Every structure is written in structure tokens, then in C-alpha cells.
Amino acid sequence: MVGQLSEGAIAAIMQKGDTNIKPILQVINIRPITTGNSPPRYRLLMSDGLNTLSSFMLATQLNPLVEEEQLSSNCVCQIHRFIVNTLKDGRRVVILMELEVLKSAEAVGVKIGNPVPYNEGLGQPQVAPPAPAASPAASSRPQPQNGSSGMGSTVSKAYGASKTFGKAAGPSLSHTSGGTQSKVVPIASLTPYQSKWTICARVTNKSQIRTWSNSRGEGKLFSLELVDESGEIRATAFNEQVDKFFPLIEVNKVYYFSKGTLKIANKQFTAVKNDYEMTFNNETSVMPCEDDHHLPTVQFDFTGIDDLENKSKDSLVDIIGICKSYEDATKITVRSNNREVAKRNIYLMDTSGKVVTATLWGEDADKFDGSRQPVLAIKGARVSDFGGRSLSVLSSSTIIANPDIPEAYKLRGWFDAEGQALDGVSISDLKSGGVGGSNTNWKTLYEVKSENLGQGDKPDYFSSVATVVYLRKENCMYQACPTQDCNKKVIDQQNGLYRCEKCDTEFPNFKYRMILSVNIADFQENQWVTCFQESAEAILGQNAAYLGELKDKNEQAFEEVFQNANFRSFIFRVRVKVETYNDESRIKATVMDVKPVDYREYGRRLVMSIRRSALM
């Protein structure tokens, strides 16, 4: 049975660092290594039939092989791709990047042969491997011959004589800006205890420059996410390094990075799977790398939408889903700094049929185009528990539309075949329902009352197609503070000035604001709702400033605006919550959004509902 293994492969790897071979080895033992909050790492003791070596490390993307028990003690596997890292003390670690289990542990049953431990420190002579075939590296896996299992006579073709390291292989030499040479090491091998190192990595994400100012001073920073074949790491530059490196570094380009400061990663602010993170310092060097074809792009560790309900609040996740629908971008004012930013909600669905609301901010919100229902892969979205489970896409998150990965093709195929006909079930509303258009949790007004929505500790949200049957125009408008961020009612001083108690200021003018009570109805029930500025303007088809002018100058025209709004139908997004006033509890319904009815989408949804009812 020894002939099944690539005898001498361990010596070839450890003495010459040969990464062009594809040896067949047996797993003797697997030991997990504690890595804090990061994915577990596994250390393997492997045999080539002559020697054993415990310096094999499994790349994290191969962890499922261990967790699903495909890779276990006594199994035989072929290593298709690996890298060799040399530690400070001269010892070598072999990181397994790609392998194939040729024979399960159950099929093999025992340790093959009588291998002895390889002693790297004694300079053990290399066992000469069999002569290589003409093109040993061209085959991606051993081909069975004469009904064999892919081992035996093909083993000698799995690897050849040792060669010098290739650019995609283990430690190589890179010239830094200082003219010296340093070894290129994998990201997975970086620790704070190393002083001289160089990595070759692809930039998969680059943040905008952010500034801060506090009692200790002010400054600026930007961050990067870097990836190579072994793993990923986050890097941050501050102040002078921002000026130096921000204009030079481009997303998706590959660079040599040297001499950064390594420290324990703050997992609160990054979804990057690494225990450490890098900070640029005065000695940091960044040099372009032209040979970039071998490096991967963004690494994802996807969480299914139906699994988000098990994730804790504020945790960071990678998610992939079809953009089922999306809302228009709106502007909101951030209270902490009075800065106006764009906000847009999008609705993502995966093969589970579950839908989650993800919120885009700033430039991501402004530039988003979901018209073709793209597949979106998002790395590092923050989980929120607002109304169930929802996601917030941070400035540090990475968004890729229609990524070239198997998960995206699988999702697109499913959606085109059957998913697009589903409403989906939202996990972003406490009482979730279907999804269609840009709203979730469809309810008739009768269902809202019969299901006691709004009676719990938290408010409930629903969407309904309803018709305006009455508008209470009395006291629907008030004179408000003219400043942008204040809507407080002003007091007419009767001297041409209007006083805002909140701002403690008098103004020569004011702005009109609306609070409109509307009775809406569908085929079963009716409901009084309160509409504030934007939703009231959408129903009436006029802005508050124009309506205020009509009210003062042309009462008849003002009346006609309200009459014309009667018996118009809309999609209402409503918040309901029980409120108590003077010991009397009642349901308060507030309109959060008003949109025109897309009758094609509405009809499709009704047809699907009828079909589901027919199957019950």
C-alpha cells in the first residue's frame, strides 16, 4: 500500500521548497488550533509513506472538509496547491490551499507503511523521487488507469524534481523601496512578533478618507482590505500615511506591502477573517506588483438570509442575495453632526425564500441601480435588530454586483427559474409577510385589526393598497421654524417676527409643515392614519409651501386640492403602535411612505395569493 503515496514528497518540499509538485499524502492526525473569534485553523500530521510531518496547515477555506468529516485521520488525498512559509527560526510551514480526498478514512482504515518523522533540523537527506513525466504539473488530478483508484502507477506523475519557487509560490524575494530584499510571506503567517516581512496582496476594498476631531486633536485615516491565497487582513493608514498612500493605491490592484505594524484586530469594526490587523507607519513600503493573475479577489464567508435571525446584534456578516426590489434614495440628517446623507433600502432574497432589508448609505445609496435585479454579494454588513433582522451596509463594507463566483450563478439560475415568482418572507418585520414592489409585509386593513398588529411592546409595520376616502383638512398645516433641521411650531409675535422656542430665536419668516389625518379603506375595512410632511404632499400632489399660499390667498383652490385627492389609491407603508393617553389606550397608525400603485405588480401578487389559497 505504500506505493499509493508519493514517497519522498515531504523531503522535496522541506529541503527545496518545491511547490510545483502535487503529492499524494495520507492524513495521520488533525489538530484544531484556537484562533480567538476567527475561524478555527487545523494543523495536520501527514505521511508520504517514508516520512511524517506535522507542519501542514489547512487554509480556512478548506475547513468544511474537516467539519464535514471528509478530511479525517487515515484518508488519502492529493495536494493540488500549497505554499511554503519560512518562520524566523528557519522552520517551514506548509499551508494547504487546494486538495482532493482520493480515498476516505473508512476505505483506507489504517496508517500506510511505517513512516518515520521528518527531522528538518538534522538536514535529513532528500529521498529521490521517481523520474517525472514530461508535463507533471499539467494534470489537475491523477487519472485512473485500468480501473485503479487514481493512485498506484500514476503516483510518480504527481510531482517531479524540485524547482525554484515560482512567483505564486511560497517565500520569494521582493525589492523594497530601500533597495533591500525581503521574503514574500503569506498573510496567514503574519504575527506581531515578526519585524521584517513582505506580503504580496490584492486590494479588495478601499474606504474613503475619514476625519475626526476631539479633545486630543484631529486627524484622518483610510483603510484597506488585502487578500492573498492564504487569507486576508485589514490595513489602516493615518495622517501622513494617508497623504502618501491614498492616491497611489487602487482597488483590485496587487502590491507588495512591507513593514507595517501588526496588532490584535478589533472585530467590532471589520468582518475580515484575521486575528491581526495592520497599521501603516513611517517605514511602510507599498510597491506595485505586475504579476497579479494568481491572487484571488474578495473572500466571502456567506451567511444565509434565514440564518441571520441567529446572528447577534451588531455582528458583521457576508451576505449574497438577489435584489428583489429597492426604494428610491432619500436624504436624512445625521443628528450627531447635522450632516445630510443619502439613504436607500434594498430588499435581498436568497434560495430560502427569505427576504432581508439592507440599507445603503451615501454614495452607495445614490449610485445604486437595481433595475435589472442583480445578484449582490456584500462583505461586512452589520446586523441590526430593528423590526426583526435587517442589515446596514457600512463604509467599510464591500458590495459586488453579479460577482463571478459559483454562489452567484446558482442564485441567478434559481431566481430566473422559480424565485422571481415568489413574494418572499421578510425577516425585517416583526410580523413578516410577502415582498413585492418595494414594500414588505402586505396586509389588508382587516388583517391588521384581526391580527392585533401594534399591540406588542414594539411597533409593527405593514404595507397595504388602500384608497383615500376622507381627508381632514382642518388644522392640517402649521407655521414652523424656517431652519433646515428644526420643525418646531413658531409663535407669531404680531410684529412681523416669528419666535422658535427650541432655537430661542426670532425669524422674519417661517415654513409650512403638514400633519394630515386621512381615512383610508380597502374592500374589507377602513383605518384612520396620520400623514406627516412627505407622505401628505404625496397624497395631495402639492408641496406644503404652495398649499400654505393657497390657504392664505385662494380658499377655493385649496379646497379643490383636497377634493381631487379623494378616491385615489396608493401603496401605504404604515407603522402601528398602541399608545396610552389619559389612561385610554388606542392604536396610532402613522404613514411612513406613500407610493403609486404598480398595478402590474399588484395584479401579479394577487394572482400568486389566489394560487396559494387554492392549494390550501
From Swiss-Prot:
Modifications made to the protein after synthesis: DNA damage-induced 'Lys-63'-linked polyubiquitination by PRPF19 mediates ATRIP recruitment to the RPA complex at sites of DNA damage and activation of ATR. Ubiquitinated by RFWD3 at stalled replication forks in response to DNA damage: ubiquitination by RFWD3 does not lead to degradation by the proteasome and promotes removal of the RPA complex from stalled replication forks, promoting homologous recombination.
InterPro entries, per database record: Euk_RPA1_DBD_C, NA-bd_OB-fold, NA-bd_OB_tRNA, Rep_factor-A_C, Rep_factor-A_N, REPA_OB_2, Rfa1
Annotated positions of the N-acetylmethionine modification: M1
Crosslink feature (Glycyl lysine isopeptide (Lys-Gly) (interchain with G-Cter in SUMO)) location: K449, K577
Phosphothreonine found at: T180, T191
Disulfide bonds: none
Originating organism: Homo sapiens
Cellular component, GO, one term: lateral element
Protein name: Replication protein A 70 kDa DNA-binding subunit
Biased composition (Low complexity): 134-145
DNA-binding region: 197-281
Modified residues (N6-acetyllysine): K163, K167, K259
Zinc finger (C4-type): 481-503
A Pfam family this chain is assigned to: Rep_fac-A_C
Family according to the record: Belongs to the replication factor A protein 1 family.
Chief subcellular location: nucleus
UniProt KW keywords: Acetylation, ADP-ribosylation, Disease variant, DNA damage, DNA recombination, DNA repair, DNA replication, DNA-binding, Isopeptide bond, Metal-binding, Nucleus, Phosphoprotein, Ubl conjugation, Zinc, Zinc-finger
GO BP term, example: protein localization to chromosome
Location of cross-link Glycyl lysine isopeptide (Lys-Gly) (interchain with G-Cter in ubiquitin): K22, K88, K163, K167, K183, K220, K244, K259, K267, K331, K410, K431, K458, K553
Residues modified as Phosphoserine: S384
Subunit comment: Component of the canonical replication protein A complex (RPA), a heterotrimer composed of RPA1, RPA2 and RPA3. Also a component of the aRPA, the alternative replication protein A complex, a trimeric complex similar to the replication protein A complex/RPA but where RPA1 and RPA3 are associated with RPA4 instead of RPA2. The DNA-binding activity may reside exclusively on the RPA1 subunit. Interacts with PRPF19; the PRP19-CDC5L complex is recruited to the sites of DNA repair where it ubiquitinates the replication protein A complex (RPA). Interacts with RIPK1.
Region (Disordered): 121-154
